[in-house]
């Protein structure tokens, strides 16, 4: 959907100067209008997703140049004199001419045929088909002349027809409250342009931008570079944190699996009781101290509680006693007297009479009491000091049991 809007924008002081010139003259006045023409395309997007495109054609009236008399740049039949136009413009360019104006006293707001002819010839002379015609028609309201009325209108030609274009005066109120004013600078004088060019290098660069703006842009570029570097560092740290979190998750998973395996192993161990383990060191010590005593080396008993020599341990455990248990060799006592061997090579057991068997516990009890008295004399003596004392003083039989 496309719309086309055209309007004239004029500042209040330009319109006021036209009125002031007319009121201070004794006759009608005409002249040329200088300004700028600008076309814009505006797109308004609505909720219905339909783009409303508007073409705005704005004509800014910035200055007017009055002629010294009527019919100064055209003759009676409406032909335009190009040289006279250049003389009127003086230092201004023809490209700045956007139209012409005329003030008529006590007339209707209507274009005459002669004005139409002059307008068409002026369009061909200046090669500008967008020229406008500003018509001002003041009149008196009261007979005393105390009150005057001024009507003004701007016309554009479309073929043989002239239509009125709306005029917006900038300083007569906020005509566009929801929009920025897009006003062009007024036509400047020669002295103004000379002063601006003289000091332009202090404020503007070669491309027309302000020096402060360039410095701010440079600072902005530096800040953007620093921000990119900071973002890169943050990204690298985030990736490192993700990697560490993944490693921690793997370690936790491995720990949980290990705990589960230990639970399963403990559950299996509780269901099946552990087998008794053999005391290898004790077995080797007995073999070393009592090499021929198979009864001491057996691990089986009969129903009466007597050891069975057939089940003695005959396995070589591969233990070096001199390295593992050196004290056993240093404190080894004289070998006990061997018992009588029977015909079958085994140890024969001789039955004692009842009297002798009853006296044996008494004799052993007396020996233990004497030994306890000797050992309790001092608590600082070692076993090596006590054993010879008992051996010499009491003449006790030396026991064949190992000393640890």
From Swiss-Prot:
Residues 339-404 are annotated as: Disordered. A motif (pSXXF motif) lies at residues 401-404. InterPro entries: BRISC_Abraxas1, FAM175, MPN. Residues 219-268 form a coiled coil. GO terms for molecular function: microtubule binding; polyubiquitin modification-dependent protein binding. Belongs to the FAM175 family. Abraxas subfamily. This is BRCA1-A complex subunit Abraxas 1. It comes from Salmo salar (Atlantic salmon). The gene is abraxas1.
């Amino acid at each position: 959907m496309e719309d086309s809007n055209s309007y004239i924008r004029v500042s209040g002081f330009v319109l006021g100067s036209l009125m002031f010139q007319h009121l201070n003259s004794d006759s009608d006045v005409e002249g040329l209008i200088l300004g700028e023409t600008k076309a814009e395309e505006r797109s308004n997007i609505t909720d219905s997703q339909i783009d409303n495109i508007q073409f705005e054609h704005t004509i800014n009236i910035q200055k007017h140049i009055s002629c010294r008399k009527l019919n100064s740049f055209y003759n009676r039949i409406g032909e335009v004199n190009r040289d006279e136009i250049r003389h009127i413009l003086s230092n201004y360019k023809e490209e700045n001419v956007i139209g012409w104006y005329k003030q008529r006293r006590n007339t209707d707001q209507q274009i005459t045929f002669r004005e139409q002819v002059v307008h068409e010839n002026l369009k061909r002379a200046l090669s500008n088909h967008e020229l406008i015609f500003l018509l001002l028609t003041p009149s008196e309201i009261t007979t005393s002349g105390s009150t005057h009325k001024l009507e003004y209108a701007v016309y554009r030609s479309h073929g043989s027809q002239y239509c009125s274009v709306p005029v917006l005066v900038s300083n007569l109120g906020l005509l566009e409250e929801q929009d920025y004013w897009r006003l062009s600078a007024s036509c400047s004088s020669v002295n103004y342009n000379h002063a601006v060019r003289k000091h332009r290098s202090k404020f503007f660069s070669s491309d027309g931008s302000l020096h402060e703006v360039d410095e701010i842009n440079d600072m902005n570029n530096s800040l953007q570079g620093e921000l990119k570097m900071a973002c890169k560092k943050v990204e690298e740290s985030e990736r490192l944190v993700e990697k560490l979190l993944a490693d921690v998750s793997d370690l936790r998973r491995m720990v949980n699996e290990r705990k589960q395996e230990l639970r399963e192993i403990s559950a299996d161990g509780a269901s099946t009781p552990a087998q008794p383990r053999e005391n290898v060191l004790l077995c080797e010590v007995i073999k070393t101290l009592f090499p021929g005593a198979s009864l001491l080396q057996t691990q089986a008993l009969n129903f009466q509680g007597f050891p069975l020599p057939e089940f003695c341990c005959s396995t070589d455990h591969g233990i070096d006693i001199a390295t593992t248990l050196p004290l056993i060799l240093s404190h080894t006592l004289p070998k006990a007297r061997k018992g009588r061997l029977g015909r079958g090579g085994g140890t024969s057991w001789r039955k004692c009479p009842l009297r002798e068997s009853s006296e044996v516990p008494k004799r052993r009890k007396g020996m233990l009491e004497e030994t306890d008295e000797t050992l309790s004399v001092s608590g600082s003596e070692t076993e090596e000091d006590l054993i010879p004392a008992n051996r010499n003083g009491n003449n006790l039989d030396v026991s064949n049991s190992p000393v640890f």
